[in-house]
Regions:
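Residues located in well-ordered beta-strands
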Residues: 2, 16, 21, 33, ...
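Glycine-rich beta-strand-centered segment in the early N-terminal region that forms part
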Residues: 21-38, 50-92
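NAD(P)H dinucleotide-binding glycine-rich loop of Rossmann-like/cofactor-binding domains
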Residues: 33, 45, 78, 84-147, ...
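Short glycine-centered segments of the SAM/dcSAM-binding site in methyltransferase folds
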Residues: 84, 142, 166, 233, ...
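Short, glycine/polar-rich helix-capping loops at beta-to-alpha or helix-loop-helix junctions
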Residues: 93-96, 171-179, 244-249
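Mid-domain Rossmann-like dinucleotide-binding core that forms the NAD(H)/NADP(H) cofactor-binding site
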Residues: 118-194
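Short amphipathic alpha-helix with an adjacent loop that forms part of the alpha/beta core around
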Residues: 196-206
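Glycine-rich phosphate-binding loop and adjacent beta-alpha segment
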Residues: 219-291, 316, 323-326
């Protein structure tokens, strides 16, 4: 089988595609024949040795995929060869066959194609955990989404609207904001050309926002936190800007606000019942037509370098997906 390999840490150009032996399922494991695998910003970080998980070389990047169950290991219940599934892992998805723990599988929702399925679980799962669980977003509140045109950003917009919130999207260009509005955003802020804090004051009549969804970090976190309303919640989702911001803690005192961490990967392991409930809710919203994964581009597995270069340059709207002929 073919796999994208990181043999030395660095930019996407250092990745190679090689033939490897097919994996074998051990106890509690499943082999998935991959149809599609989507890119996420951690894939850019992990190949540079800048992610919190640091796998030994060589390894395949990629954390979510869709496909067919090829083989099940001893003790696996609920899955059989031929089942259509979504799978998630810390790394390893950019390959034609992937070995995963059975607990890392979710049945594909009816009516969902492989490309959309590969773009669904991590982005919508993260955003649902962030907004419903960690942020306690309520109907009628105002949600500010940073990096709103990315995969998790668009998912946050759709989930925020499904929950009855008013959503303000922040992105770096007019065309990105147009995509955000197509996915339900009520208003947009172009932080490349507009003063974010002043625009938030204007859009909220000076009240501020109730919840900030922040997968970006860098220079945007502090002004977003300063723009929260009383008892506001800032959700720390990631650091796509590359810089981990340093926040003056007196802001939390003055505003009675909270800074809340969101780590979906550990949540799925530590709280399996809550994770199952989240998946059930996401499936229901998908069937109701409220969630529509935005796959902007597809590449064959062999062109993973080109796809990751787009992700690293922050030129992606929604999700980019790698496809296989498996």
């Amino acid at each position: 089988m073919k796999a994208v390999l990181c043999k030395q840490f660095g930019p996407p150009e250092l990745l190679v595609v090689e033939e490897l032996p097919s994996p074998k399922a051990g106890a509690g494991e499943v082999i998935v024949s991959v149809k599609a695998a989507s890119l996420n910003f951690p894939d850019v970080l992990i190949i540079q040795n800048k992610y919190q998980f640091k796998p030994p070389l060589p390894f395949s990047p990629g954390s979510e995929m869709s496909g067919l169950v090829k083989e099940v290991g001893e003790g696996v219940k609920g899955y059989k060869p031929g089942d259509r599934v979504i799978a998630f892992t810390t790394y390893g998805a950019f390959a034609e066959e992937v070995k995963v723990e059975a607990t890392r599988l979710v049945p594909m929702p009816e009516g969902m194609d492989y490309n959309s399925a590969a773009a669904f679980l991590l982005t919508y799962g993260t955003s649902d955990h962030a907004l419903r669980d960690r942020g306690q977003l309520r109907a009628g509140e105002t949600l500010l989404v940073l990096g709103a045109a990315g995969g998790v950003g668009l998912a946050a917009i759709e989930i925020g609207k499904a929950m009855g919130a008013r959503v303000i999207a922040c992105a770096s260009s007019a065309d990105k904001l147009e995509v955000c509005k197509q996915h339900g955003a009520d208003a947009g802020i172009n932080y490349a050309t507009e003063d974010m804090r002043e625009k938030i004051k204007e859009l909220t009549d000076g009240k501020g926002v109730d919840v900030v969804y922040d997968p970006v970090g860098g220079p945007y976190t502090e002004p977003a936190l300063r723009s929260t309303a009383w008892r506001g919640r800032l959700l720390v989702v990631g650091f796509a800007a590359g810089e981990i911001p340093k926040i003056p803690l007196n802001l939390t005192l003055l505003k009675g606000c909270s800074i809340v961490g969101v780590f979906w990967g550990d949540f799925t392991r530590r709280e399996p019942k809550a994770f199952a409930s989240s998946i059930a809710q996401l499936g229901a919203w998908f069937r109701e037509g409220k969630l529509k994964p935005h796959v902007s581009q597809t590449f064959p597995l062999e062109q993973a370098v080109e796809a990751l270069k787009l992700m690293a340059a922050r030129k992606v709207k929604g999700k980019v997906v790698l496809t296989t002929t498996a």
